[in-house]
Amino acid sequence: MFQDYLNDDTAEQWRWAGLYFDAKEYSQAADLLARVVERTPEQVGPRLLLARAYYHSAQLGRAEEQLREVIARDPVEQYAHLMLGRTLQRRGRPAEAARWLRLASALEGGGAPDA
């Protein structure tokens, strides 16, 4: 389990980051999550939440970077594909986004959506 990888300080940052995220304080959550990811780079969960915090705080370049790293570490993480597609849409790259959204749909079991 993820918590097994954390020391007390990192666990506390993870806990607070979740509270900030739930309170829609995405920039504060991202600051803490970046530290957690730095200490536990092999863990996908904190990195995915960091990407979501970046997305919701309109730090789309950073969100894209983290989502690509999540997918590199866990190629079947459906939500990362979906979020990457949405991030690329918001960045004005609809053709590139479509590929990731199709993959997300396929991973979810819905097959590729009609174009």
Residue ranges, per PLM feature:
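Alpha-helical segment of the N-proximal tetratricopeptide repeat
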Residues: 7-38
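Structural signature of tandem alpha-helical TPR/SEL1-like repeats
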Residues: 23-31, 57-69, 91-103
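Conserved structural position within tetratricopeptide repeats
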Residues: 37-38, 68-72, 105-106
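TPR/TPR-like (Sel1-like) alpha-helical repeat modules
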Residues: 78, 82, 86-112
